[in-house]
């Protein structure tokens, strides 16, 4: 049975109340459940080497075929990482963050680039990784909310109005609201990537990152396999 999520969220609320004093507005609470099901490609629990970041890609669309371009187009809103127990706590398997947008559209997070301006309505992604470099052993999960509607305890993952004059304006971007996998898996669905295990239940699973160029080869191989299987089934069905 899972431990209630109230404690981490109360901690986030306390941080938010402190941060929203002054010129900041449009606070976002984001993260996972306490004692969540977070795994790597082998089915092992994610360890303290992982980080969890929320951000946008501007006008760039991330796909499995252009993984080598993600880092160059990534704009960080906030990051949760170890050893901050209220960021990424690998022992209790939860990550949590609270971040406010400034009226000019920049993020108040110390992990964000102060030059990055986030346009209202921009799609927000969650990127989990043990390294943003594509090297042997790198594992990623990149997921987002495809429905863009309130549900599963989460608000739509889109940048709110940073100039909202209400100091109590807030949004909740929780992992439970993720429904699209660019790489890795979320909420029981494995997306693109290489895995050696499939957990019975998972909220997030990272996948091995393909080396540049290999993603197209993998997709081509998969397409060829499906074509051969289709031809074989067609021959078997003929009298």
Residue ranges and their predicted role:
Residues 225-239:
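C-terminal membrane-anchoring or membrane-association module
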Residues 211-228:
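A short, hydrophobic C-terminal helix/tail in secreted or cell-surface proteins
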Residues 2-10, 230:
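Bacterial N-terminal signal peptides that target proteins for export
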């Amino acid at each position: 049975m899972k431990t209630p999520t109230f404690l981490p969220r109360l901690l986030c609320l306390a941080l938010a109340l402190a941060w929203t004093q002054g010129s900041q507005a449009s606070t976002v609470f984001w993260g996972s459940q306490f004692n969540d099901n977070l795994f790597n490609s082998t089915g092992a629990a994610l360890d303290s080497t992982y980080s969890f970041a929320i951000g946008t890609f501007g006008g760039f669309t991330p796909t499995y075929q252009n993984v080598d371009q993600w880092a160059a187009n990534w704009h960080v809103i906030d990051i949760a990482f170890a050893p901050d127990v209220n960021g990424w706590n690998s022992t209790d398997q939860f990550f949590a963050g609270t971040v406010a947008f400034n009226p000019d559209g920049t993020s108040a997070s110390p992990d964000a680039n102060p030059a990055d301006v986030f346009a209202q309505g921009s799609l927000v992604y969650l990127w989990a990784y043990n390294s943003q470099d594509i090297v042997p052993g790198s594992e990623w999960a990149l997921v987002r909310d495809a429905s863009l509607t309130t549900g599963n305890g989460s608000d739509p993952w889109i940048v709110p109005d940073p100039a909202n004059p209400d100091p109590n304006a807030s949004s909740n971007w929780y992992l439970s609201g993720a429904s699209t996998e660019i790489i890795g898996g979320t909420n029981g669905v494995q997306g693109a990537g290489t895995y050696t295990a499939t957990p019975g239940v998972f909220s997030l699973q990272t996948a091995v990152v393909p080396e540049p160029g290999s993603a197209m080869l993998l997709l081509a191989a998969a397409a060829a396999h499906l074509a051969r299987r289709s031809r074989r089934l067609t021959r078997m069905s003929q009298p």
